Amino acid sequence: MANRILIDTNVLLDYLLERDPFFEAAKEVILSCINGKAKGCIAAHSIPNMFFILRKDYDAKERREILLNLCKIFDVEGIDKTKLIAGLENENFSDFEDCLQMECAKSYKADYIVTRNVSDYETSEVKAIMPKDYVSL
């Protein structure tokens, strides 16, 4: 059975912006979802964050098209009141956004959070793994 993964915003941006030296591993993670080797998910709050970050490289129409394509490829796990409260009450995370990523991963029943910021997820209930390590599984 395919792994269920939540792909962190930084990995998606590595792919979309072709950031070296991270692009190739990010591409392999995304291709694993497209090819059915993994079931991929992104957190809904990653979409507006990426829309903002990508503004330096793409105009609004291009950003909408790029992000719409991501939403078609991946499942999208939303943030609701329950996840927000759980994130706000969780003092084990220093970064609130990372905690929300973990809450989305839990809700999605993800096996892994694929991220370059593994150290930010030391207290995560879902194992965090680097893209290069994930593609080596």
Predicted regions and their residues:
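Short, well-structured N-terminal submotif of metal-dependent ribonuclease cores
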Residues: M1-C41, R55-E62, T123, S136-L137
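Acidic, PIN/NYN-like endoribonuclease modules and their adjacent C-terminal/linker elements
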Residues: A2-R4, K106-L137
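A general alpha-helix detector
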Residues: V11-L12, N49-M50, A86
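Short, flexible helix/strand-to-coil boundary loops that buttress conserved ligand/catalytic motifs
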Residues: L16, L88-E91, E125
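Short, conserved alpha-helical segments within structured domains
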Residues: I42-S46, K83
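Short acidic, glycine/proline-enriched helix-loop-strand junctions
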Residues: R63-L84, Y121-L137
